[in-house]
Amino acid sequence: EEFSELLDGAASGDALDEKKRSYAKRTNLRDYAILALLSGTGMRVSELVGIDLDDIDWKKMKVKVIRKGGSEDLISLNEELVQILQDYIQFERKSYDDSQRALFLSSRGTDHNRLTVRSVERIVEKYGKSTVALKKISPHSLRRGFGTELYKSSHDVYLVQQALGHSDIKVTAEHYIDDSESVSERISEFSSGLLSPSSYNPKKI
């Protein structure tokens, strides 16, 4: 719900003030693609800003990133993310200098350099602050939210570790798994399953 609220705000721009909305018209597709990629893959902001156009394999629907520590990894993209990125590249990014191979570029000045980590943090904060429920949102909170939702869906901490690119599974378990309620619910469901209702007859006890 929080992810969709953030993306809806970025798509419409309605939550931004007039000045920010006017500026956002030039970067709307870029900003939306950034927010969608962060919330839809859980990648680090440093990994996102390091992506070049050539790092995207459109046929296999994967993007190459440089993980923490310098190792290369491939992150899968769903069809929606592929379409979002293609729209950004076709309708907005193509107006920039072709000599710059970075996927996400700054719209300031004439050089249109690669976006920095801090620039992306400001973009996320801008849309987060404009949405009441997400005032303190950051790229890292999007990453953590992705990891938490993936675990709730899969109940597989190893899958989450792989998706987030953690070398140590303890980091995944301690910092990205916020699932205490569902754990209790699953324990209750398991114990209930051990007691078949058809076998219970108080008269025979």
Language-model features and meaning:
Residues 1-205:
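Conserved catalytic core of the tyrosine transesterase superfamily
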